[in-house]
Amino acid sequence: MAQSCTTEGYLDAMKEVLVLTERRYEGDGSLSNMPQEYVDNVLQEDGLVVDALVRVGFAAKRVAWCNDGIRWDARGAALFRTTWDYFDRWETFSAWLNHASNHTTLFNDAGIIRWNLDKHYLQDLEQEGVAVVPTAYVPKHGHVPLFEVCDQRGWNDVVIKPAIAGGAFDTYRVTTRGDGQEISPEPSNGSNSEELWHGLVAKHDMLIQPFLQDVVASGEVSLVWIDGQITHAVKKRAKQGDFRVQDDHGGTVKRIDVSDELVQLGTDIMERCTRLCHDRGWASPLYARVDLMRDDNEAWQLSELELVEPELWFRFCPPAADALAQAIQGRLQA
């Protein structure tokens, strides 16, 4: 059953930009069951964007994407930020996206949103020449044993994840050793790897990727890209004994300086992505997060390119929020 959302006013022509969140984080975030520090970070991040939009002349406010009181048939703009429940409510979200995109300017472009929601986009980027973490794709209800894919690829340590999900939802590391297998995190029902795999592929299109040891040793680097330039970068590290770098699972994040080489790599990835978008008739991406890991040969590979609702860590670089607001102003005035 779809979750009900509060009623809040109307979308007021081109002067208003809605900063989209989810129901749990609307208002003061009191409906969330996450730790208060986590909620405070969400509110701070969105608040920095709202304030930046106000500084360039918009009437900006945060609302849940499912807010029943928003008139999407009026002119206006909406910016995806913390809409992290979309995969929990996929059918409802998809219907909303179809409706809103017919009446409202969305950032990023609705075509980009639809494309990037499904991790099969990695195939498209690889075809554009981007070095992507090697990935095997298994369709929902696909009768392919996990061990068979791993044997064919020569992988004995893999990450399995849904094609449509976020925050490491239903994501596991499966390691095969001479004396058996280890699954992290341990399945709550005690299932073995094949039982776990068949349960997941019964629900989702799935991805299988080799586990890259450097994500534990050094972490994952994320480059934040706003309207044509890398504004800042962070490094995410998993907590001891885990591989998931998300703060939902105890991971930590800090701002870092990155080499010119890495900035150029991120820029090149975004140029290739932008060409792909133009070829498909979409607007250029407004914002992105480029997530990179080193492989076992110390070469950088793209793990994900987040174009829907990435955390962009404006609290580490507030001027990037101003750059985002100015870019929105420029596009709406064009």
Please provide the spans of the model-predicted regions.
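Conserved N-proximal alpha/beta basic substrate-recognition cap immediately N-terminal to
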Residues: 10, 22-140, 144
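Extreme N-terminal starter segment of soluble prokaryotic enzymes
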Residues: 13-18
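Short, solvent-exposed loop/turn elements at beta->coil junctions and helix N-caps
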Residues: 66-69, 210-214, 290-293
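Structural detector of well-ordered beta-strand residues that form the stable sheet scaffold
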Residues: 78, 106-107, 133, 159, ...
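Rossmann-like NAD(P)H-binding beta-loop-alpha module
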Residues: 129-162, 168
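Phosphate-binding site of ATP-dependent enzymes
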Residues: 169, 176-276, 301
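ATP-dependent carboxylate activation and anion-phosphoryl transfer catalytic cores
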Residues: 243-244, 261-334
